[in-house]
């Protein structure tokens, strides 16, 4: 297993969302491209506000690349998320910071009638401040991750219909 792939046991917080897409010919690169455009406009404003706030505490704010400047390879960035691994059906984004480390796993797998898209978030807080940060961002994280997955499935499956699995 490549070093960039996280080990689940090291991340005490994990969540996962899935969606079905009628396209069967999808790979991780298409997922990354869809991820890069799936955030609603308000998410960018929220991230800019978050960056101004957490910079005062010495936390990473990351580069905010625009969609036209994406580098879809390990070491590149999508927004403030560093691409840590890119395989045929799995992409791992993430960052390690003082308060916590996180990984976003984007995967696609074939299933009857198309593909299953899956987004997992894994977080390893380092201390109470990391747990506090996680508790504060979780409501927005859950809303945004579900919304982004739905938008990814819609964009990737424009030749057919798609929807969020419940």
How would you name each of these model-derived features?
Residues 98-135, 139:
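Beta-strand/loop substructures that line and gate deep hydrophobic ligand-binding cavities in soluble
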Residues 44-51, 55, 130-138, 145:
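Short hydrophobic helices that act as membrane-entry/anchoring signals
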Residues 58-68, 142-151:
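Low-complexity, charge- and small-residue-enriched intrinsically disordered regions
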Residues 12-18, 90, 116-118:
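Intrinsic-disorder/low-complexity, polar/charged segments enriched in Ser/Thr/Lys/Arg/Asp/Glu/Gln
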């Amino acid at each position: 297993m490549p070093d960039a792939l996280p080990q689940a046991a090291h991340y005490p917080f994990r969540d996962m969302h899935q969606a079905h897409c009628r396209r069967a010919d999808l790979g991780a690169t298409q997922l990354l491209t869809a991820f890069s455009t799936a955030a609603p406009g308000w998410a960018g404003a929220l991230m800019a506000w978050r960056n101004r706030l957490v910079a005062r505490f010495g936390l990473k704010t990351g580069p905010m690349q625009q969609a036209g400047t994406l580098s879809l390879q390990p070491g590149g960035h999508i927004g403030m998320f560093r691409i840590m691994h890119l395989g045929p059906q799995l992409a791992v984004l993430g960052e390690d910071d003082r308060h916590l480390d996180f990984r976003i796993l984007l995967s696609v797998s074939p299933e009857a009638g198309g593909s299953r898209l899956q987004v997992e978030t894994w977080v390893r807080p380092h201390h109470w401040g990391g747990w506090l940060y996680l508790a504060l961002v979780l409501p927005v994280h859950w809303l945004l991750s579900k919304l982004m997955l739905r938008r990814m499935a819609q964009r990737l499956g424009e030749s057919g219909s798609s929807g969020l699995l419940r």
